[in-house]
């Protein structure tokens, strides 16, 4: 079972009935250039979260015509899960980031945030509040797997969050013959990790069907540059990739980073 994590995480934010609150996954899907109904966001858009999805949502909002897109994140940049280049590109496109801030409530055209401070590596409330003008709010607090269909199966157990499935080293759940991997098990959520889970599970499934145990072979030796015996070593500068000008980038969904060749 490898169904991914496609459900947006929910958070309870006190809001007026007229407040416009969206989840980032649905927003990005609706914002697709082939979609007939583009989201109506207003002039000022707030994005709650600090991951790559939050960066994508903020940059997409700018491309849909928002005058201002601001990210609200409860920790500092050092602890932000988004890739460094994603944050750099978002900032260069005019996205504002409010660090150490958490949303307390939302009204029709404004958001109240509480400032945080880092104490012993943790973000804690300060009791200091700030009001930010915003016409809409996009929640980008991560995704989770829809694992409800597994909860009636005896033997399958879940982590504390109730959405990730516990597996043994062979990628098998507590029910014999049911294996799981990817975003629905405790791990880093990357394509590389999910691909590795698939390969590992396939080998163990094959062994289980044969009523045997898969034994992992020894790792191949690591070949360093010294062992390659390359007769030359260049000190040439790294070739820079061309970037689309910021003024044009925020008006299009085209690639903004070109390849190494033209």
Regions inferred by a protein language model and the residue ranges of each:
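Conserved beta-strand-loop-beta-strand element in the redox core of flavoprotein oxidoreductases
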Residues: 1, 107-131
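Glycine/serine-rich phosphate-binding loop and adjoining beta1-alpha1 elements at the start
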Residues: 1-30, 257, 261-262
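N-terminal glycine-rich dinucleotide-binding loop that anchors FAD/FMN and/or NAD(P) in oxidoreductases
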Residues: 16-31, 37, 79-108, 113-114, ...
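FAD-site-proximal beta/loop scaffold in flavoenzymes
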Residues: 17-43, 120-188
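Rossmann-like NAD(P)H-binding beta-loop-alpha module
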Residues: 36-66
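A conserved FAD-binding loop/helix module that cradles the flavin
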Residues: 57, 181-212
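Rossmann-like dinucleotide-binding cores of NAD(P)H-dependent redox enzymes
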Residues: 58-103, 215-227
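Mid-to-C-terminal Rossmann-like scaffold of FAD/NAD(P)H-dependent oxidoreductases
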Residues: 89-92, 102-104, 109, 200, ...
């Amino acid at each position: 079972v490898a169904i991914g994590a496609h459900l947006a995480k929910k958070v309870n934010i006190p809001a007026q009935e007229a407040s416009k609150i969206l989840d980032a996954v649905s927003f990005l899907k609706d914002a697709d250039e082939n979609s007939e109904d583009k989201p109506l966001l207003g002039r000022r858009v707030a994005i709650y979260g600090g991951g790559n999805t939050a960066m994508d949502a903020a940059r997409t909002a700018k491309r849909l015509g928002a005058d201002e897109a601001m990210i609200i994140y409860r920790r500092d940049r050092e602890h932000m899960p988004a890739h460094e280049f994603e944050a750099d590109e978002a900032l260069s496109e005019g996205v504002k980031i409010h660090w150490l801030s958490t949303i307390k409530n939302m009204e029709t055209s404004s958001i109240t945030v509480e400032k945080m401070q880092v104490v012993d590596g943790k973000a804690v409330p300060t009791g200091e509040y700030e009001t930010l003008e915003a016409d809409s709010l996009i929640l980008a607090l991560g995704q989770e797997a829809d694992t409800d269909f597994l909860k009636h199966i005896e033997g399958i157990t879940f982590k504390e969050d109730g959405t990730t499935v516990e597996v043994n080293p062979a990628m098998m759940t507590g029910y014999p013959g049911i294996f799981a991997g990817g975003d629905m098990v405790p791990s880093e959520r990357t394509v590389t990790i999910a691909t590795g889970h698939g390969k590992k599970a396939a080998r163990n499934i094959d062994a289980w069907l044969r009523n045997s145990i898969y034994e992992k072979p020894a790792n191949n030796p690591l070949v360093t540059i010294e062992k390659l015996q390359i007769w030359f070593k260049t000190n040439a500068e790294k070739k820079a990739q061309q970037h689309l000008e910021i003024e044009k980038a925020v008006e299009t969904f085209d690639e903004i980073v070109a390849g190494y060749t033209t």
